[in-house]
């Protein structure tokens, strides 16, 4: 979740510089029903971060021009313009607007990019932007859509799931299973090292229940104990999809 503003009070100048003033996130957990954050609604995850931004920056929220939130599955608890729902849930000023956008896995990044572009253009001065996805409560694919749910469209458009696409690219470019397993292992080691050394503690906001008890304080789904042998024993994630003809 980012707080983005500029150093100009002029409206619609040729060019402003957009600054990331602050950035926070929740700890990450497993996106399944047995994940640590399963009991927490998406709007509560978001509201906790919004309140943290407000408190640590002594922010008068009436100065916030807009809130932009990326969300891949904007349905159910994540539907109905979740950006505005989080604003209201956090108790921010009623004048603060909100918009939700979807660019699949790049939704949160697109939200930040859009906020930066609006600030740089002079359209807005202060925006909160980020992404939200609570996959333990709103699983991937919950929102349906033509690509996965309309066979005629999927065949006509040549739809290929992301995992199959990644496997295909790896094959074309000559990456072996051992190559990508080694990359994954190094990623897990670096994530564990960063967490254990507290490198991102200032940005990670603990998640609390309605009584103020901490549910999750640090990322708990990093596989620090992974080994090449262990990874090598896992089945290919998209093997069955490949058998179906993708």
Regions found by a protein language model. Give the residues of each.
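Flexible glycine-/small-residue-enriched beta->alpha junction loops
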Residues: 120-173
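Conserved active-site "lid/cap" helical segment
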Residues: 12-90, 97, 105, 168-177, ...
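Short glycine/serine/threonine-rich phosphate/pyrophosphate-binding segments
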Residues: 29-30, 79, 109-114, 133-139
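Conserved catalytic cysteine-centered active-site region
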Residues: 71-125, 156-164, 228, 232-246
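Short, Lys/Arg-enriched N-terminal segments with co-localized hydrophobic residues
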Residues: 1-13
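Structural alpha/beta core scaffold segments of enzyme domains
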Residues: 3, 60-61, 65, 120-121, ...
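N-terminal extracellular/periplasmic Venus flytrap/periplasmic-binding protein-like
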Residues: 15, 24-27, 38-48, 56-58, ...
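Active-site-proximal alpha-helical scaffold in enzymes
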Residues: 101-132, 170-200
């Amino acid at each position: 979740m980012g707080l983005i503003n500029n150093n100009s009070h002029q409206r619609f100048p040729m060019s402003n510089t957009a600054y990331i003033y602050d950035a926070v996130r929740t700890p990450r957990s497993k996106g399944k029903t047995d994940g640590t954050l399963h009991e927490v609604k998406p709007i509560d995850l978001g509201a906790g971060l919004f309140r943290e931004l407000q408190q640590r920056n002594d922010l008068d929220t009436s100065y916030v021009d807009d809130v932009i939130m990326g969300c891949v599955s904007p349905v159910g608890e994540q539907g109905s313009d979740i950006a505005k729902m989080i604003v209201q849930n956090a108790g921010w000023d009623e004048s603060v607007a909100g918009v939700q956008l979807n660019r699949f896995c790049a939704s949160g990044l697109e939200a930040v990019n859009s906020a930066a572009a609006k600030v740089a253009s002079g359209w807005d001065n202060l925006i909160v932007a980020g992404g939200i996805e609570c996959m333990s409560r709103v699983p991937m694919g919950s929102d349906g859509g033509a690509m996965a749910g309309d066979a005629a469209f999927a065949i006509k458009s040549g739809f290929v799931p992301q995992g199959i696409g990644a496997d295909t690219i790896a094959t074309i470019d000559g990456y072996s299973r051992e190559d990508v397993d080694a990359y994954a292992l190094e990623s897990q080691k670096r994530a564990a090292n960063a967490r254990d050394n507290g490198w991102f503690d200032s940005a990670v906001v603990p998640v609390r229940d309605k009584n103020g008890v901490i549910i999750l304080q640090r990322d708990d789904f990093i596989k620090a104990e992974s080994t090449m042998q262990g990874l090598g024993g896992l089945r290919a994630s998209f093997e069955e999809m490949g058998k179906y003809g993708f």
